[in-house]
Regions:
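Structural detector for short beta-strands of small beta-barrel domains
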Residues: 18-28
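Intrinsic disorder/low-complexity segments
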Residues: 1-16
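A broadly tuned, weak detector of single residues within folded domains
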Residues: 16-18, 57
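Long, highly charged, low-complexity intrinsically disordered interaction regions
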Residues: 26-90
Length: 90
């Protein structure tokens, strides 16, 4: 992987355990969504773009990025893979 652009490596090879979550839209605010999948409610931080895409839907699939730190495990949800990749470039 010598000389490979670090950003390209991040976007194409990120090591998420969860690629996406499909489930019932249980709660929705402009900054967070709760998707229930198989009895588990996943709280995801979302963008206004994803919020707009979810409005009025009872079920959805969100692509996920997991931020795992010593003091917190945070999930970010995105309406599209492209939105997630853009987030990873920031």
């Amino acid at each position: 992987m010598a000389h490979q652009d670090y950003r390209t490596h991040l976007t194409t090879n990120h090591t998420n355990m969860i690629n996406y979550i499909r489930g019932i839209v249980d709660e929705l605010t402009p900054t967070q969504a709760t998707l229930e999948a198989h009895g588990v409610g996943y709280l995801l931080n979302i963008s206004l773009n994803t919020y707009t895409a979810l409005q009025g839907k009872s079920e959805a699939r969100l692509f996920v990025y997991e931020s795992i730190r010593e003091d917190a495990w945070t999930l970010f949800g995105f309406a599209t893979k492209q939105e997630r990749e853009l987030f990873l470039m920031l």
